């Protein structure tokens, strides 16, 4: 009787697989969803999924890659935490608010993904992307999804090639000798003479609905190999600085090329200064400016980026103070009215610039529109949440304490990265 029941279940699975094949062969469009699991109760690093990595919330890196890949009919973040939900929506994702039953420490990824599938019956293919994969690029997702949509696989997962010699674990203090698991110690191969082993790197797992209903992997499965530079593990605090350096070099920074930035607009109050205005006994107004920040401005100017300091009607600067700042920084200082966005657009029109050519540094609610529209944007560490959510980069430094220098270095790093890529593309074109 048990055998008959097993055959019946197998028959059901075969029917599902044949149905998926019919859809593929007929060219019928299947709904493909990206799903990032981001529970609030991370044990290794508290709220790790929205901790800022290289100026971007961790889940922002994979959400940017998923959205820009243009492969998904919907992009989702599954969470049980209000702050993660806010960040997810800011980065263009829909939110699956998971139930308490799948939000426990003991809950598995499969439990959550199956709940998501039940609540979204229109979804045919789920691409489960790990939030801890900040070096993921759109082309990785596109190529892996084609293995499902064009090659007929029902389960695809990412791997990386490792060249690690593994040994059997034995009890400490015991007399049992360890044994090699994947090598002959008498004939140790050189790295270049050994193909290594394929290991899951956890970047993503893609499954058809039929597959996910019976497990995370199954059916006709395949691996998608990623290069080591794109494979990053973030589990404990010590991984964070390593991942930050890796993502600055190999991360995906978006569709717009950062080298086109021609102009930086930077707020004086709350960015270049700490927001305080000191008044002398004679009534003279003074502000404190960090020399690191003024050096950052000069670094940009030397690279051909114009820097204009701006002040809103709510933070008026005296003419003497504005002149002093202009002289010290070598920048024009402009006083803007209440319509900051409108005046910035007029300024861009005068200079024949587009938003992607503008970097904007703000610090509060009036700056949100410009922070959203600018090709690059940033806020100091101590900016309010409304501004942080709108900015593309969140500084580690506070206002008046190096935030402008940090953002300047970020702009220059992206320009250098883009210039290097352009040079590499030129070499490839000339060679081939």
Swiss-Prot record:
Pfam families: CTP_transf_3. It is found in: Nucleus. Expressed in testis, ovary and liver. The active site is at 188. Signal peptide: none annotated. GO terms for molecular function: keto-deoxynonulosonic acid (KDN) cytidylyltransferase activity; N-acylneuraminate cytidylyltransferase activity; N-glycolylneuraminic acid (Neu5Gc) cytidylyltransferase activity. Catalyzes the activation of N-acetylneuraminic acid (NeuNAc) to cytidine 5'-monophosphate N-acetylneuraminic acid (CMP-NeuNAc), a substrate required for the addition of sialic acid. PANTHER family: HAD SUPERFAMILY MEMBERS CMAS AND KDSC (PTHR21485), N-ACYLNEURAMINATE CYTIDYLYLTRANSFERASE (PTHR21485:SF3). Belongs to the CMP-NeuNAc synthase family. This is N-acylneuraminate cytidylyltransferase. It comes from Oncorhynchus mykiss (Rainbow trout).
């Amino acid at each position: 009787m048990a055998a008959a029941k097993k055959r019946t279940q197998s028959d059901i699975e075969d029917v599902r697989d044949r149905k998926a094949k019919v859809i593929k062969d007929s060219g019928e469009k299947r709904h493909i969803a990206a799903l990032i699991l981001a529970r609030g109760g991370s044990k290794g690093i508290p709220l790790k999924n929205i901790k800022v990595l290289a100026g971007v919330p961790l889940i922002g890196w994979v959400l940017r890659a998923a959205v820009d890949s243009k492969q998904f009919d919907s992009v989702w973040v599954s969470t049980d935490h209000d702050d993660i939900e806010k960040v997810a929506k800011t980065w263009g994702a829909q939110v699956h608010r998971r139930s308490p039953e799948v939000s426990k420490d003991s809950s598995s990824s499969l439990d959550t993904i199956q709940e998501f599938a039940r609540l979204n019956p229109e979804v045919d293919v789920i691409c489960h992307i790990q939030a801890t994969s900040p070096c993921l690029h759109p082309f990785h997702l596109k190529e892996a999804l084609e293995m499902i949509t064009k090659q007929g696989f029902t389960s695809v997962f990412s791997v990386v090639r490792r060249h690690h010699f593994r040994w059997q674990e034995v009890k400490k203090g015991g007399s049992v000798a360890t044994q090699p698991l994947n090598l002959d110690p008498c004939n140790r191969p050189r790295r270049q003479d050994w193909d290594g082993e394929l290991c899951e790197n956890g970047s993503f797992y893609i499954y058809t609905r039929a597959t996910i209903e019976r497990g995370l992997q199954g059916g006709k499965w395949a691996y998608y190999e990623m290069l080591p530079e794109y494979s990053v593990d973030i589990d404990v605090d010590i991984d964070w600085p390593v991942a930050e350096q890796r993502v600055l070099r190999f991360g995906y920074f978006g569709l717009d090329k950062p080298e086109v930035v021609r102009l930086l607009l930077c707020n004086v109050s709350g960015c270049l200064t700490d927001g305080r205005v000191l008044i002398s006994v004679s009534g003279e107004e003074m502000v404190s400016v960090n020399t690191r920040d003024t050096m950052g401005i000069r670094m940009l100017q030397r690279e051909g980026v114009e820097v204009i300091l701006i002040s809103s009607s709510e933070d008026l600067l005296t003419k003497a103070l504005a002149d002093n700042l202009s002289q010290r920084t070598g920048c024009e200082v402009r006083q803007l009215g209440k319509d900051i966005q409108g005046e910035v657009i007029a300024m861009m029109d005068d200079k024949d610039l587009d938003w992607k050519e503008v970097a904007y540094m703000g610090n509060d609610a009036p700056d949100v529109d410009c922070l959203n529209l600018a090709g690059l944007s940033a806020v100091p560490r101590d900016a309010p949440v409304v501004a942080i959510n709108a900015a593309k980069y969140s500084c580690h430094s506070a206002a008046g304490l190096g935030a402008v220098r940090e953002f300047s270095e970020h702009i220059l790093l992206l320009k250098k990265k883009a210039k290097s890529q352009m040079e590499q593309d030129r070499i490839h074109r000339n060679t081939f």
